[in-house]
Regions:
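N-terminal/domain-start alpha-helical segments
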Residues: 1-122
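Short, Lys/Arg-enriched segments at the junction into DNA-binding effector domains
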Residues: 3, 114-150
Length: 150
């Protein structure tokens, strides 16, 4: 199951994207309308986060930096602001990809899968508690390694 956190304040885009992703096999989508809503889901495990840059209560780039303390999964920014400076800033501040609005859902799906594939090719799966690979868990925050939960 691919878990997606969708952070989007525009109800039409949020509902359309959510419906499209849920129609795909093995997708579970959690929707958040604001940065505060997204933070309430911060400790849950997600495979990818889709986030608008312009949110009513915060800037998506700032939210990205806060979510990075819990998540190492790919963060894909979406925005109608598609100038070079905005895109570069979003990527430099922790985003993994950027998709300008309006976007085609098939392109969004391809970007999601490409970003997930990139993480899987690293041989480790990101999670809320760190990286898991075989019997090992690496927690970058505490600089510790566990084998079989010990």
């Amino acid at each position: 199951m691919i878990r997606v956190l969708l952070v989007e304040d525009d109800p039409v885009i949020r509902d359309t994207t959510c419906y499209f992703l849920k129609s795909q096999q093995n997708f579970e989508v959690v929707c958040a309308e604001t940065g505060g809503d997204a933070l309430s889901h911060a400790r849950e495990k997600f495979d990818v986060i889709l986030m608008d840059i312009l949110l009513p209560d915060t800037n998506g780039v700032d939210l990205c930096q806060r979510l990075r303390s819990w998540h190492h999964c790919p963060i894909i920014f979406t925005s109608c602001l598609d100038d070079t400076d905005t895109i570069v800033h979003a990527l430099e501040m922790g985003g993994d990809d950027f998709l300008a609005k309006p976007y085609h859902n098939k392109i969004l799906l391809a970007r999601i899968m490409a970003n997930i594939r990139r993480v899987q090719m690293d041989g480790a799966e990101p999670s809320v508690n760190g990286y898991h690979c075989a019997a090992f868990t690496l927690d970058a925050n505490s600089h510790s390694v566990e084998k079989d939960g010990r």
